[in-house]
Amino acid sequence: MKLALNTFVQIKIKNMTFQELQPKVTEITLNSKQSIDEKLLSICQLLSDSIDYYNWVGFYFANHESKTLHLGPYVGAETDHTVIPFGKGICGQVAISNENFVVPDVAAQDNYIACSFTVKSEIVVPLFVKGENIGQIDIDSHVLDPFTTEDEKFLEFVNEEIAKLY
C-alpha cells in the first residue's frame, strides 16, 4: 500500500499546473535557511520533478567582463558545457539578445551546442536584475516541440522571483 501511495503522490506532482507551482517557487525563494544556490537547486528540482518534459533544468550566470556564461545549479544529466561564450549556442545567443529563445527541434537549429542525443528541444529565458541580464534559466526536453507561451510566462515568473534574491 505504501508503494501505491508514493506512486500516486508522484503522479499528482507530475500533473501540477504552472499556477499550482508558482506559490511553491515563491516559498523556496523566501526560505531564509537556504543559500541562493540551494534555493536555485531546489527550484530546479521542483521543476524537473513537476513537469514531465523538463528533463534538464539549470541556470547559467553571465560574466560580462569575459563575455561568458557559467553553469550554476542544475538538475539532470551531467554536462560538459560549464562555460559558454556569449553568442554560442542557444544560451549564448540569449546572453546577447536578452530575449526568450524557444527551440522546438534542436536538430533544425544551426547555432546549437549538443548536450546529449536525447535532447530534442530547449527553452532559455533570461534572468534580469535591475534591468541587467545576469543569467538565464535553461530547460532541455527529450520531447519535440513541448514548450508553449505558458512555459515562457511561467519561467519569466520564476526568474522574477529569483531576481528578488539579488
Locate predicted features:
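Short, Lys/Arg-enriched N-terminal segments with co-localized hydrophobic residues
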Residues: 3-15
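Intrinsically disordered, low-complexity terminal regulatory regions
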Residues: 12-74, 78
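Short loop/turn motifs at secondary-structure junctions and domain boundaries
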Residues: 51, 114-119
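Regulatory sensory and allosteric helical modules in signal-transduction proteins
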Residues: 62-68, 72-114
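A short, aliphatic-rich beta-strand micro-motif
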Residues: 121-128
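Sensory-domain boundary capping and coupling elements
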Residues: 128-141
